[in-house]
Amino acid sequence: MLLKELSALASPLNDQQIGQLQQAASELSPQQLAWVSGYFWGISQTSGATQPINQAAAAVSSQPAGKLSIIFASQTGNAKGVAEALKEEAAAAGIAVELFDASDYKGKHLAKETHVIIVASTNGEGEAPDNAIELHEFLQSKKAPKLDNLHYGVIGLGDSSYEFFCQTGKDFDAFLSKQGATPFIERVDLDVDYEAPAAEWRKQALDKVKEALASEAQSAQVVQLPVGQAAHTSQYSKQNPYTATLLTSQKITGRDSGKDVRHIEIDLDGSGLTYQPGDALGVWFENSPELASAILKQVGLTGDEAVEVDGDSISLQKALVEKYEITSANPQLVTQYAELSGSKKLEKLAADKDKLRQYSGNTQVIDVLSEKKAKLTAEQLVGLLRRLTPRLYSIASSQSEVDEEVHLTVGVVEYLQGDETRFGGASSFLSHRLEEGDDVKVFVEHNNNFKLPQDDNAPVIMIGPGTGIAPFRSFVQERDNRDAEGKNWLFFGDRIFTQDFLYQVEWQKYLKSGIVNQLDVAFSRDQQEKVYVQHRILEHAAQVWQWLQDGAYIYVCGDATRMAKDVHEALICVVEQHGQKTREEAEQFVNELRKAKRYQRDVY
């Protein structure tokens, strides 16, 4: 409400007080106004609530409270979630706190800060998340300011199965230290089961921040500052998922396809959950009871043994099915089991980081345990395992099209290991173990780094081979329902046209109606020489360049290991050739597209 409107309402202030407020407000920025509102609220809760306005204004200007700034660099939302929890805990502890998306934070402002915590995930091959590219580059440039007065902490999130584990967090730590900043707490690098150690680190960090701020400004009125960007609110979350209903699980690859890809439909009716194109759905799943039994047999346990999980005593069998990751191996598991079993093969792998990473990334837990049989205690077994985490799937529907449903495109992991068939955890849960009508626990993971342009007239280029097509089904449904005038160009690729053309009928319908203006496909095994989406991009290089000149946004979804790199290289070649630029200039041009959010990727 504007201050000038106060006089027309039943206000407890007299005209002189209103005039004083108007005068003070005219000289303050929006952030300062928000601070003042919190300051006055704090005064109202104390015995000094009758302090005159002019005295309060003087207090605001002469005794600003120290604050903690939290910056999150997040690709899929995990780092954002940790940062939001940190912000809430700081506010509850009476610490003035402000939360920033890294894309909204200007690096030069660090010189004015006293206490900062950065929560950073790592994208692809050690790259900064899209929302942190600009800040990441700034801090390693000559423009980075001296930060002698800054005290900082860093939480890195990652997956130890990858070579550049928590690299972005390590980078920020190094950048800040180089500029003279002092860590008030040691950086922590957290694996996929990060929740418990992250909570402990947050507690330690906030204890140190509270003590430091108290000593800096004993008399300052501590208030809570606003979050830099409004967060999505819902009663359901990763920690409190919604129990939804599976409506459909339909195979959409041909009977002779080497792949089993499912179109999944889930009912959200009554949940209040909302999502936008580009968001992901988190799915909590249960492990295969048969796999749990096989693991127990391999290590000489029955499953009846009691183990403590989250303060509760449950059977080991139940723990393996519901609480622990028993499908995918990881380097730590391989290294620890090498010690427990005395396996020479595993010991040799553990001594070579590259081979260890490759082995653990392509091997399931049961196959690691089968390298050499060893009898374990229940505690030793669960000590080897990570906690179960939900799987995130790109949402393949627009809510403007499907209303109270959410659709997924799930590639079922299934392959032979010797004489045994191995299955993926979440994908086999959704495709084989759940029946239509069964419950499934889900939550929405918002992704602000993969969003359609706000301008409906902007052209869009979508590159999504395989199940990477999922978000683009959502994009096109949304653009259709919004009557967006912008052109849409889809690149899709897979193995065989007759077996693996996902949602073929839908794309042909959209092409015929003009919603999709151009569709280019690459089926790698339909000819002797393999053809992939990056080849189609290069074939249409002149047209791609023209679309970029017309303001097109480029989106890439799918495999990070090869496809995303090859597409990135193809885009650089397009810019170099048709933009008449040097290689270095072309790389910079593509990088500027990313900074401007005109080149967005959801790769995994």
Curated annotation (Swiss-Prot):
Residue numbers binding FAD: 327, 361, 391-394, 409-411, 415, 424-427, 604
Entries under InterPro entries matching the protein: CysJ, CysJ-like_FAD-binding, CysJ_Proteobact, FAD-bd_FR_type, Flavdoxin-like, Flavodoxin/NO_synth, Flavoprot_Pyr_Nucl_cyt_Rdtase, Flavoprotein-like_sf
Keyword flag Flavoprotein: yes
Protein's pathway: Sulfur metabolism; hydrogen sulfide biosynthesis; hydrogen sulfide from sulfite (NADPH route): step 1/1
Enzyme class: oxidoreductase
GO MF annotations, alphabetized: flavin adenine dinucleotide binding; FMN binding; sulfite reductase (NADPH) activity
Residues annotated as binding NADP(+): 524-525, 530-534, 566
Ranges in a coiled coil: none
Record's cofactor remark: Binds 1 FAD per subunit. Binds 1 FMN per subunit.
EC number(s) reported in the record: 1.8.1.2
Matching CDD domains: SiR
Domain Flavodoxin-like span(s) in chain numbering: 68-206
Keyword tags: Amino-acid biosynthesis, Cysteine biosynthesis, Electron transport, FAD, Flavoprotein, FMN, NADP, Oxidoreductase, Transport
GO BP terms in the entry: cysteine biosynthetic process; hydrogen sulfide biosynthetic process; sulfate assimilation
Superkingdom of the organism of origin: Bacteria
Reaction catalyzed: hydrogen sulfide + 3 NADP(+) + 3 H2O = sulfite + 3 NADPH + 4 H(+)
Cofactor(s) in the UniProt record: FAD; FMN
UniProt-annotated binding residues for FMN: 74-79, 121-124, 157-166
GO cellular component, one term: cytosol
Signal sequence, start to end: none
Tagged with keyword NAD: no
UniProt cross-references to NCBIfam families, sorted A to Z: cysJ, PRK06214.1
UniProt subunit comment: Alpha(8)-beta(8). The alpha component is a flavoprotein, the beta component is a hemoprotein.
Family per record: Belongs to the NADPH-dependent sulphite reductase flavoprotein subunit CysJ family.
Function: Component of the sulfite reductase complex that catalyzes the 6-electron reduction of sulfite to sulfide. This is one of several activities required for the biosynthesis of L-cysteine from sulfate. The flavoprotein component catalyzes the electron flow from NADPH -> FAD -> FMN to the hemoprotein component.
Name of the protein: Sulfite reductase [NADPH] flavoprotein alpha-component
Gene behind the chain: cysJ
